[in-house]
Design a protein with these regions (language model features):
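Active-site-lining helix/loop region of Rossmann-like oxidoreductase modules
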Residues: 1-80, 85-88, 107, 114
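C-terminal helical cap and adjacent loop that interface with cofactors, partners, or active-site loops
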Residues: 81-154
């Protein structure tokens, strides 16, 4: 059997991006991956198979980022096969004064991901040559006019 190297979840990059946007300086970052199982067989249309009870049906990736400013970011991303009682949701909780939680039930994940990428095209055209990380881009904006109206380097 081939050995498997550890995988870094997208949440790892997300924490770095958030810290950069907030002017925080990262001192350490760790990721913990936790496999999840279901008590019943789950049919996956995407995989074209039934995953037997007790086999992995999900992975929780928990990334903890410590900063010089004594602010800790803990983010979690779960990729899974849903059982009949489950739906996708995004939950963000900011701990502090006041504690705030935002929950988006059944987000349009595919559409939101595609819209975010497409709306970045004018910024990509305007970006300097070379490798530029997205934390250096301006904030994304909703385009109400044709895309070419947002290209500034014409």
């Amino acid at each position: 059997m081939a050995s498997m190297s550890p995988r870094i979840c997208g949440t790892w990059n997300q924490n770095g991006w958030l810290c950069s946007k907030m002017g925080l300086h990262i001192t350490s970052q760790t990721q913990k991956c936790i496999p999840c199982v279901d008590k019943e067989d789950l049919k996956s249309e995407t995989l074209g198979m039934v995953v037997k009870a007790g086999n992995a049906t999900a992975m929780r990736a928990i990334v903890t980022t410590e900063t010089e400013e004594d602010i800790t970011l803990v983010t979690e991303c779960v990729g899974k096969i849903y059982n009949l009682e489950e739906t996708d949701k995004n939950v963000w909780t900011l701990y502090g004064e006041p504690e705030t939680t935002c929950i988006v039930n059944q987000p349009a994940t595919v559409e939101l991901t595609c819209a975010t990428l497409v709306n970045r095209i004018p910024q990509l055209i305007d970006a300097p040559a070379g490798y530029v990380t997205t934390d250096q881009f301006p904030y994304n904006e909703y385009m109400v006019h044709p895309m070419n109206c947002y290209v500034k380097s014409k």
